[in-house]
């Protein structure tokens, strides 16, 4: 124990050894002293430990309506999909809290299948759900997976991504969310079972079955293929929520045929031919997924099916401006840091939305379009201190014209509006 330094007559911290002159405060106990820096360090350690314990528990899971309200802050439209997701997620974590059994009734897991076109918000919905619940989240691409023993990734590597997202806290990872994208790409090549091996299609579905349902999986800590001379991380997937998303191009034709077969008959109207793609997707059933190429066992482990609509121009404009992390808000903030006000005219927003629709990229393509428009602006503006405002017009987006600039002396420059 450190007490008095006989030469200098000073007290020292019993933990770090610093003298009372080197710290702001020294607290005395029975024959022991601790400085304010060590107290702060101990507090952080305790808070971190307690915080980790609290995050693993899900005693206050938001109600479905609360989940949908928070989703509305980040994701525009897709109301039916939000409602389906909110109920499924609430029931999933309610099941975890009840230890999966209520009065000897076993509650099964509600994994989710998201069906919708590219850029409709499938990944964003899954990410936002994980953020709401404060659980680890991982994204995997189904196209990179192959059956064990073939070139490609093992399905266990999906679990490794989740463990890494949880900072290797396995208990925390066991209550996380995994989003598997492009799940439609692992559909088998034909509806009838093949005698040839389909290692990146049906083989992947077979490999995913166990982890979707719930099993104790052995995960290589460094990823890659398993070999017998390495240690494994054991993780129970029973309480991991799996969300599988895909565009399922062509499934609307399968739905249309099913609906058409049911309405064809004497004196009946074939309404299926008149239904829009979005309306058809909302009528998807497990039997349609079976005809598309998913195996029955795989479909059975994804009991919740939610369909997303193609985003129209109005929805894309709202995505640009309304969410908390809207792209327009982000770019305005970036220019604000250079003391320049940024404005997007309504016509400019409409033109950006039209370009995204033309490219068939949905909301996913909005950022690259704005980045192209803003490149010269963000390159030149930091070097100029005479600009007060930058206005992105419809002509800037549609025709590539320079944006309108308002100088600090009131002069307006650009697009035939030069004035003093």
UniProtKB/Swiss-Prot annotation:
Query: What PROSITE patterns does the database record attribute to this sequence?
Result: CLPX_ZB
What GO cellular component entries does it have?
HslUV protease complex
The residues that hold ATP are 117-124
Keyword match Repressor: no
The domain of life for this entry's organism is: Bacteria
Q: Which residues bind Zn(2+)?
A: 13, 16, 35, 38
Tell me the first and last residues of the signal peptide.
none
GO terms for biological process, alphabetical: cell division; proteolysis involved in protein catabolic process
**What GO annotations for molecular function exist for this entry?**
ATP binding; ATP hydrolysis activity; ATP-dependent protein folding chaperone; protein dimerization activity; unfolded protein binding; zinc ion binding
Q: Report domain ClpX-type ZB positions.
A: 1-54
Q: Tell me, in a sentence or two, what this protein's role is.
A: ATP-dependent specificity component of the Clp protease. It directs the protease to specific substrates. Can perform chaperone functions in the absence of ClpP.
State the similarity comment: Belongs to the ClpX chaperone family.
- Would you tell me the protein name for this molecule? ATP-dependent Clp protease ATP-binding subunit ClpX
């Amino acid at each position: 124990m450190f007490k008095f330094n006989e030469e200098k007559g000073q007290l020292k911290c019993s933990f770090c050894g610093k003298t009372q002159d080197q710290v702001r405060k020294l607290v005395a106990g029975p024959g022991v002293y601790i400085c304010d820096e060590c107290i702060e360090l101990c507090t952080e350690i305790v808070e971190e430990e307690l915080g980790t314990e609290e995050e693993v528990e899900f005693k206050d899971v938001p109600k479905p309506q609360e989940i949908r309200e928070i989703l509305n802050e980040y994701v525009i439209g897709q109301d039916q999909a939000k409602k389906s997701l909110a109920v499924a997620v609430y029931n999933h974590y309610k099941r975890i809290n009840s230890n999966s059994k209520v009065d000897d009734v076993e509650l099964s897991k509600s994994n989710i299948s998201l069906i919708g076109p590219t850029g409709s918000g499938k990944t964003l919905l899954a990410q936002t759900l994980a953020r709401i619940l404060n659980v680890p989240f991982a994204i995997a691409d189904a196209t990179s997976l192959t059956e064990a023993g073939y070139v490609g990734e093992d399905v266990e590597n999906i679990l490794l991504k989740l463990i890494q997202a949880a900072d290797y806290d396995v208990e925390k990872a066991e209550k996380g969310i995994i989003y598997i994208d492009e799940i439609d790409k692992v559909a088998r090549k034909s509806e009838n079972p093949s005698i040839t091996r389909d290692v990146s299609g049906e083989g992947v579905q077979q490999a995913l079955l166990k982890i979707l349902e719930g099993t104790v999986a052995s995960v290589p800590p460094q990823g890659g293929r398993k070999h017998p001379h390495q240690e494994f991380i054991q993780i129970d997937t029973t309480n991991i929520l799996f969300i599988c998303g895909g565009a399922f191009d062509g499934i609307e034709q399968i739905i249309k045929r099913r609906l058409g077969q049911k309405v064809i008959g004497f004196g009946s109207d074939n309404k299926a031919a008149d239904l829009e793609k979005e309306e058809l997707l909302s009528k998807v059933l497990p039997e349609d997924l079976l005809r598309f190429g998913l195996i029955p066992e795989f479909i059975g482990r994804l009991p919740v099916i939610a369909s997303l609509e193609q985003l129209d121009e109005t929805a894309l404009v709202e995505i640009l401006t309304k969410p908390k992390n809207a792209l327009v808000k982000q770019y305005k903030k970036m220019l604000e840091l250079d003391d320049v006000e940024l404005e997007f005219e309504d016509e400019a927003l409409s033109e950006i939305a039209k370009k995204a629709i033309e490219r068939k990229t949905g909301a996913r393509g909005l950022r690259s379009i704005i980045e192209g428009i803003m490149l010269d602006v963000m390159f030149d503006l930091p070097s100029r201190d005479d600009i007060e405002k930058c206005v992105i017009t419809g002509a800037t987006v549609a025709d590539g014209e320079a944006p309108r600039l308002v100088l600090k002396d009131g002069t307006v420059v650009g697009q035939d509006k030069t004035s003093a």
